[in-house]
UniProtKB/Swiss-Prot annotation:
Disulfide bonds: none annotated. This is Probable transcriptional regulatory protein RHE_CH03475. It comes from Rhizobium etli (strain ATCC 51251 / DSM 11541 / JCM 21823 / NBRC 15573 / CFN 42). InterPro entries: Integrase-like_N (IPR017856), TACO1_YebC-like_2nd/3rd_dom (IPR048300), TACO1_YebC_N (IPR049083), Transcrip_reg_TACO1-like (IPR002876), Transcrip_reg_TACO1-like_dom3 (IPR026564), YebC-like (IPR029072). Belongs to the TACO1 family. GO terms for biological process: regulation of DNA-templated transcription. GO terms for molecular function: DNA binding. GO terms for cellular component: cytosol. Keywords: Cytoplasm, DNA-binding, Transcription, Transcription regulation. It is found in: Cytoplasm.
């Protein structure tokens, strides 16, 4: 689980969050629109929409923005977004998974391929790296939800597989298929989660040096800056010394 904390800390480093936040609301709105379009526009009847709204609220997205994104799904002239997954390789033989919501597959594929190439990586075929990741559910809580023992006990009772706690919060992992059931059980014991989502968790991490880590960060930053890209996952890890430099 150490790789999860490391990746999160590197991606959430100082100076990066302002750049990410400027695009965050539009990405969250797109997920809400897609979720509302895929089912009923009522979050009580649409699990995906309920989670999308919950995650948007966790990022302090205004209610007006959320309502507008839901209404957009009902519009006759609203865009149709496709869910696309790209898989590729970064510096040092690292694996990268990119999830996107796009209204133009050709544009997004071209942009993603270009970003990989410029960073010294390569876009692969679907399935080329995802076999080395597990698609799991992740439920996060702030530290205020309780101490590590309380959260661990609640997670076990809810049917979760693992819990990781650090200075930022609690990260509960469960089977992807059980995400709705586990999150509902946790809500009964710990209250509403900060985020509930499906993630790609690397089975094994690939150690890289500082130079390759810097290149990987630039690659991932460029991917995240693309309007169509929703999530990026990788399997690299660095030493504690390098982590301290990268997170500064």
């Amino acid at each position: 689980m150490a790789g999860h904390s490391q990746f999160k800390n590197i991606m959430h480093r100082k100076g990066r969050q302002d750049a990410v936040r400027s695009k965050m609301f539009s990405k969250l709105a797109r997920e809400i629109t897609v979720a509302a379009k895929a089912g009923l526009p009522d979050p009580t009847m649409n699990a995906r929409l309920r989670l999308a709204i919950q995650n948007a609220k966790a990022q302090s997205m205004p209610k007006d923005n959320i309502d507008r994104a839901i209404k957009k799904a009902a519009g006759a002239d609203g865009e149709n977004y496709d869910e696309v997954r790209y898989e590729g390789y970064g510096p040092g033989g690292t694996a990268i998974i990119v999830e996107a919501l796009t209204d133009n597959r050709n544009r997004t594929a071209s942009n993603v391929r270009s970003i990989f190439t410029k960073a010294g990586g390569a876009l692969g075929e679907t399935g080329s790296v995802s076999f080395s990741f597990d698609h799991v559910g992740e439920i996060t809580y702030k530290l205020a939800a309780g101490d590590a023992d309380k959260v661990m006990e609640a997670a076990i009772e809810a049917g979760a597989d693992d819990v990781e706690t650090d200075e930022e919060g609690h990260y509960i992992t469960c089977a992807f298929e059980a995400l709705g059931e586990v999150s509902k059980a946790l809500e009964a014991s710990l209250g509403e989660a900060e985020t509930v989502k499906a993630v790609w968790r690397a089975q094994n991490n690939v150690p890289v040096d500082e130079e390759k880590a810097q290149s990987l960060m630039k690659l991932i930053d460029s991917l995240e800056d693309d309007d169509d890209v929703q999530n990026v996952y990788s399997n690299f890890e660095v030493s504690e010394e390098v982590l301290a430099k990268l997170s500064a």
